[in-house]
Structure formats: C-alpha cells, structure tokens
Amino acid sequence: REREHRRRVAEAEAQRIRELKALAKRESETWTEIFALIEQMQAKPYAEAVRLLVKLRDLAEYQGEEAVFQQRLNRIYEQYSRRSALLRRLREAGLQQS
C-alpha cells in the first residue's frame, strides 16, 4: 500500500516535470498570451492569465529563475495598477508583488 502511494507520487512528479519542460519550450509565447488575456479586461481572461502565471511561476522555481519571474510579475503590477480585479486575482493565487 505504501509502495503504491510512493509510486503514484513519483508518477505525478514525473508528469509535472514533463509539463514544465513542455511549458519551457513555449514560455515566450505564454507571456504574450498572458498580456493579450489581460488586455481583454474581463473576468474569464483574467482567470486564465492568472492560471498561466501560476504555471510560469512553477517553471521559474523548477529552473531556479524565481528572480526573473518576479521582475516580470512586478511589471504586471505596475503596468496594470488600476485593474483591481486583476490584482486581487493575482494576490489570491499567491502571486505577490515584491
């Protein structure tokens, strides 16, 4: 039973790493998509932008590039400082400005 649990955890982690590596190949396009979603100024696109930002944060952590990600996130906070709904969603997702 414990062995099965460990196997499932290892499989899940391997899948997560595969997904992060796939995301790394399209990181630039993902940032472009995020800004396009934000520009729509609607709830669903904001939610999708935040979902993608969380994935990019995970990728940055995996690659040891947290500082670079944080700089880009800070720019979003600055560039869209008047979009309270977006900023609230970012904070709720744990994407804090620093």
Language model segments and positions:
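C-terminal structured domains
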Residues: 1-98
